[in-house]
């Protein structure tokens, strides 16, 4: 086997024909400035080629079902292994995905509970055992006389297939009726049953249909006996009767000769792993379908401005835009008459009874009124009033319009399911225990608590023999999660609430558990979101992978990871068009010795981010959060000084995001920005009057499509289009500003609709994107491109970098101010028209920061940033600090969640949470200046900070 991976002529994105040789079975770190080409080399070249070669080994039939990658722009790569990418972009937003399901621990738990779980009666809690046929018959006979019974044997339960053999066997055995997916059919009247083989089906044999009478007991007993024989111990009995109004009232019960409570007759099916899945209908709660929550419209989300009257917009557009002669408006008038109230008074002053019926309906109470149509026709009405909220919920369920669904969804909040109380499963499933805990109670434990649970778990010798392999797998997976610094996470934690770093480390733990050998792993900043204290554990886990015989390529900026690496590759020297070259490679000492390497300058100490000589005094005012209880926060009171750069620190899982993102941002934004999302649990926030707005500057993309770019996002494209519309050629032709937009008809190329590229479908090969043959990739039509400013057309301007555009637009302040702030935050290399899909998270965040800097400051803005150093090199952090200091110097307050010590040491004030993560966190460990926090021996942040301040 070859000892090296050899890359020749890599030209993907900004790479300038890079030739590189890296050792196999080692830990290799790719570093360099944000936008220098690290990810282009690691992910878009090495991983893409490895993936492409694997996919090419499959049949063309299999290839058409895979998300194929385009061939990277590289001459040659030799010595590649099968490649696995572990990046930060694949966080699962599915509300059904949890830490337990993603790591497959939950699959093993389901198997464990199905095999050694002890079932209990959900009513009385006693252990339950099987029912005899006599017991089942006694239970049936206890129902009201005269009820019609349908006694059935379950044959197929939610399995895919056509099931032709099963149906043929039923017909041969002389049965007349079956129930397929809830519908009764006669097998003797139908030759073929064309079931969709790709869908799951449920089939029951109808054993007998009989009226419940004492004299029919022996016939019922015979039917039950045959049903449990055919249904492998189970029978479904349908009880059919009529209510007082004569409406059909059906109820169905499942009985089993295997498990049932003798006192309450509660029976459960034979325990199978799928019973314990909240993603399958067999065990999931029927009300919330296993989500644990239901969507409800909150009163406060409907009544957005209670100080206004209903007709003036207290409920947004509900009623305020309604025709006075409309049906609902006349009903509203009658409701007001009934309550002797005036619709012109502010909503908050209306009687409570009226407000309640307005929102939730009149129930059975009917309104009597005279309705006059627009044509003058008069009708006498007598009916109930549905209520605004039930009406919206009904429309949400009935409408096919995405627009209406989206509008109503914005008013909805998650409410804990009233049936399962957030437990996701049926009560019969929750009554099965192992070690005294049901499966949901076990997943509510943190990883560390679960490890202790399995260490102390006592099982009988028989149960130990059955579960030995299952518990071994569970213990190993839990240990790997703890090893990568995720011991504080609960197994029930929703995957969508994890940070990019957390989800990446979960996948890393899963890979360690897989035990693969000879694989090329490519990781994207695994240290993100990890406190310095936990870095050693992560590096140990990474070293495990290489010791097993794997190659690790890690895109990373963390100093500890660089020192732990066997080989470092530094890409640069700059970013964008100024990067894409191999600056240095080798050991840490080799990088330090390279004078051209900016990374080497920081590692050697020749260049560093200085500690501020003084800390800002602030305004003397405070933003106070009282009684913060969200997630693991322990009813804490937090004081945030106004007019300072504030860092919220602490180990992973200590409660930083709960405090800042859930309570602080949503709490302040609900007042200043009219945000409708409900803030995290707390008593109150004081001092909001010190701010006119709050802005959350995260690393999410500035747009989801290639049409979004830095010029459109910052607002710079408007004055650029204005400028082109003022050119003599444009005026002569009558071109307006809209002519220079590639998003609307008129000036854009209609062949590609302003995209500049067209897609060629290749079926079992990846789709190929080629420049538009009409406009050549320019995005505009020929006539529009004839209008020029200083010799350049609009398409050529979008191809300019920020650095090139600065002198080009030097006399236009409305454009220059945007360019200058982009250059100030270190983005001089990006193109004005660079598609948002090609920007890294760090670049997107700095574009947002530049946009804020270009606005006129009020000095009363609260800025919130969650780990802004993600994806940033030492030199990029230097530029970030310049921006954060500028924002703070203008009188604004900046609150940053951060683990990076270079940022923390520059803060005016630190709030350190902990001391541990999960249940061991949620308290304030230390507050004050970096110097004050460094003196706190209980603070892990303080211990590391002390070294930085020397």
List PLM regions with ranges:
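Conserved phosphate-binding elements of NTP-dependent enzyme cores
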Residues: 1-950
């Amino acid at each position: 086997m070859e000892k090296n991976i050899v890359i020749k002529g890599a030209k993907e994105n900004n790479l300038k024909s890079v030739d590189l040789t890296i050792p196999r079975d080692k830990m290799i770190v790719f570093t360099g400035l944000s936008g220098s080409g690290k990810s282009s080399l690691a992910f878009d070249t090495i991983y893409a080629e490895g993936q492409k070669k694997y996919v090419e080994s499959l049949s063309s039939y299999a290839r058409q079902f895979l998300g194929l990658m385009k061939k990277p722009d590289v001459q040659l790569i030799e010595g590649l292994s099968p490649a696995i990418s572990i990046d930060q972009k694949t966080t699962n937003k599915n509300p059904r995905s949890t830490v337990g399901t993603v790591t497959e621990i939950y699959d093993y738990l389901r198997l464990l509970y199905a095999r050694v779980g002890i079932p209990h009666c959900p009513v009385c809690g006693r252990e339950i055992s099987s029912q005899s046929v006599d017991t089942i018959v006694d239970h049936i006979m206890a129902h009201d006389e005269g009820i019609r019974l349908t006694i059935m044997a379950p044959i197929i339960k939610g399995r895919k297939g056509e099931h032709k053999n099963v149906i043929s066997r039923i017909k041969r055995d002389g049965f007349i009726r079956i129930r397929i997916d809830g519908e009764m059919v006669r097998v003797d009247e139908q030759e073929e049953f064309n079931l969709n083989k790709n869908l799951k089906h449920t089939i029951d044999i109808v054993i007998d249909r009989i009226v419940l009478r004492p004299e029919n007991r022996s016939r019922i007993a015979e039917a039950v006996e045959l049903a449990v024989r055919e249904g492998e111990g189970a029978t479904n009995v349908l009880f059919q009767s009529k209510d007082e109004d004569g409406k059909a009232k059906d109820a169905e019960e499942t009985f089993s000769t295997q498990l049932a409570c003798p006192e309450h007759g509660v029976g459960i099916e034979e325990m199978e792993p799928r019973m314990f899945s909240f993603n399958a209908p067999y065990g999931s709660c029927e009300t919330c379908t296993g989500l644990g929550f239901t969507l409800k419209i909150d009163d406060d989300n409907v009544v957005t401005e209670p100080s206004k009257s209903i007709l003036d917009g207290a409920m947004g557009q509900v009623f305020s835009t309604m025709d006075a002669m409309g049906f609902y408006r006349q009903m509203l008038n009658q409701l007001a008459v009934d309550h002797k109230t005036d619709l012109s008074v502010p909503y908050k002053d209306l009687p409570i009874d009226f407000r309640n019926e307005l929102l939730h309906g009149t129930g059975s109470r009917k309104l009597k009124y005279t309705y006059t149509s627009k044509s003058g026709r008069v009708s006498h009405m007598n009916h109930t009033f549905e209520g605004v909220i039930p009406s919206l919920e009904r429309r949400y369920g009935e409408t096919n319009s995405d627009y209406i669904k989206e509008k109503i969804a914005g008013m909805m909040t998650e409410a804990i399911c009233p049936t399962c109380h957030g437990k996701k499963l049926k009560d019969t499933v929750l009554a099965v225990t192992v070690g005294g805990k049901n499966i949901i109670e076990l997943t509510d434990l943190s990883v560390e608590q679960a490890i202790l649970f399995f260490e102390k778990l006592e099982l009988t010798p028989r149960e130990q023999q059955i579960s030995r392999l299952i518990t071994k797998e569970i213990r190993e997976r839990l240990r790997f999660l703890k090893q990568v610094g995720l011991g504080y996470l609960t197994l029930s934690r929703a995957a969508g609430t994890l940070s990019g770093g957390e989800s990446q480390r979960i996948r890393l733990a899963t890979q360690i558990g897989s035990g693969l050998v000879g694989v090329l792993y490519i990781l994207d900043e695994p240290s993100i979101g990890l406190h310095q204290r936990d870095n050693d554990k992560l590096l140990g886990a990474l070293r495990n992978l290489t010791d097993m015989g794997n190659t690790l390529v890690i895109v990373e900026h963390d100093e500890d990871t660089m020192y732990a690496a066997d080989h470092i590759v530094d890409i640069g020297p700059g970013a964008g068009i100024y990067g894409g070259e191999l600056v240095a490679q080798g050991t840490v000492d080799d990088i330090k010795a390279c004078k051209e390497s900016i990374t080497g300058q920081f590692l050697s100490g020749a260049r560093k981010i200085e500690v501020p000589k003084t800390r800002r005094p602030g305004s003397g005012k405070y933003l106070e959060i009282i009684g913060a209880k969200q997630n693991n926060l322990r009813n804490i009171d937090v004081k945030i000084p106004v007019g300072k750069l504030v860092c919220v620190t602490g180990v992973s899982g200590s409660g930083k995001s709960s405090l800042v993102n859930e309570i602080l941002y949503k709490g302040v934004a609900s007042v200043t920005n009219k945000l409708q999302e409900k803030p995290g649990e707390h008593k109150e926030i004081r001092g909001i009057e010190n701010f006119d707005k709050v802005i959350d500057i995260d690393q999410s993309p500035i747009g989801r499509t290639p049409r979004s770019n830095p010029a459109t996002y910052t607002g710079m494209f408007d004055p650029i289009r204005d400028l082109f519309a003022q050119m003599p050629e444009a005026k002569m032709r009558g071109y307006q500003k809209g002519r220079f937009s590639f998003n609307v008809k008129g000036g854009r190329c209609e062949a590609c609709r302003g995209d500049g590229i067209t897609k060629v479908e290749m079926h079992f090969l990846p789709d190929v994107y080629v420049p538009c043959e009409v406009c050549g990739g320019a995005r505009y039509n020929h006539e529009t491109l004839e209008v020029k400013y200083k010799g350049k057309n609009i398409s050529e301007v979008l191809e300019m970098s920020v650095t090139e555009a600065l002198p080009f637009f030097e006399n236009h302040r409305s454009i220059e101010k945007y360019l200058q702030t982009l250059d100030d935050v270190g983005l001089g290399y990006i193109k004005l028209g660079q598609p948002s899909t090609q920007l890294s998270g760090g670049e997107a965040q700095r574009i947002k920061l530049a946009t804020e800097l270009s606005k006129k400051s009020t000095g009363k803005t609260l800025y919130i940033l969650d780990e802004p150093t993600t994806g940033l090199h030492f030199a990029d952090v230097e530029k970030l600090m310049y921006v954060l200091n500028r924002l703070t110097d203008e009188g604004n307050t900046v609150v940053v969640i951060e683990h990076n010590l270079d940022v923390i040491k520059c803060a005016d004030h630190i709030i350190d949470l902990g001391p541990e993560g999960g249940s061991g966190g949620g308290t304030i460990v230390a507050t004050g200046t970096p110097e004050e926090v460094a003196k706190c021996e209980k603070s892990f942040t303080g211990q590391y900070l002390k070294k930085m301040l020397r």
